[in-house]
Amino acid sequence: MAVVTMRQLLESGVHFGHQTRRWNPKMKRFIMTERNGIYIIDLQQSLAYIDRSYAFVKETVAKGGTIMFVGTKKQAQEAIAEQATRVGMPYVNQRWLGGMLTNFSTVHQRINRLKELDEIDFDDVAGSSRTKKELLQMRRERDKLNKSLGGIREMTRTPSAVWIVDTNKEHLAVEEARKLRIPIIGILDSNCDPDLVDFPIPGNDDAIRAVGLLTRVVADAVAEGLIARSGVKAGEGAEAVGAEEPLAEWERELLGGEAEQAAVDATGGAATEETPAAESTGAASEAAAVSEAAEPATEQPAADAEA
């Protein structure tokens, strides 16, 4: 199943770039045409790059990594907070503080301070050893820290990769990530520099729906990675992770074989009537052969019954 469809990209306006006078010539290879003074991004390439980024994020999280979501522009703030919270990843959707990655040890001290302030009951003036004025100042400090660091309060180390909406606006985050050699996944609008992004997704980084769709795709990749990390299936119809897929199929076949044997024991051979139907398909006959090879003893009672 496709990660995202062409129709979804079109409906969200992912193909709209900036005006032709506002562009980066390095983006020429991602632009399909120009219409009414606006560049149209090639969505066929976008689909391919989305699949590539999706696979990278999923693999990174499956190996125990974290993805930081970054988007401080108005169009991205809600989607960044919502999707990152959904999958339990750190995010920055207000102001990017200088050194948030390159000077993380200092930032982590401020995070610890925020956690300390969260434990204080600011409404219990009588039971506190502090004055009302001191509590008010501490409440303001807590609110200020929560606004800038609330999204990364559970982050204990620098992330394995960062998802960035609008690399031009978030140039500080891009610079810090590149300095630390942290992979960058980002939306590339027609005015962006593709050389700064490791896993680019050509698309519109200004429309709320486009930003929301692409951020949700990244969050879905994180969710699949978390499922793979815990070894749990994504659900009916979802693909198993890597080499575990055949194992899961054989487990289902073996479970089916055990259920059939139980039916034979209970009804005295009634379940054998389904054998011709099972043999009518190649997959079922192959599974039956494997079950027969794996459990030769289970066929003996049926043979005795026929005799």
From Swiss-Prot:
Pfam families: Ribosomal_S2
GO molecular function: structural constituent of ribosome
GO cellular component terms, semicolon-separated: cytosolic small ribosomal subunit
Keyword annotations of the record: Ribonucleoprotein, Ribosomal protein
Gene3D superfamilies membership: Glucose-6-phosphate isomerase like protein, domain 1, Helix hairpin bin
Keyword Transferase: no
Biased composition regions of type Low complexity, renumbered to the chain: 259-307
GO terms (BP aspect): translation
Chain intervals for the UniProt region annotation (Disordered): 256-307
Top-level taxonomic group: Bacteria
Family, similarity comment: Belongs to the universal ribosomal protein uS2 family.
NCBIfam families: rpsB_bact (TIGR01011)
Name used for this protein in its record: Small ribosomal subunit protein uS2
Taxon lineage: Bacteria, Bacillati, Actinomycetota, Actinomycetes, Propionibacteriales
Name of the gene this protein is made from: rpsB
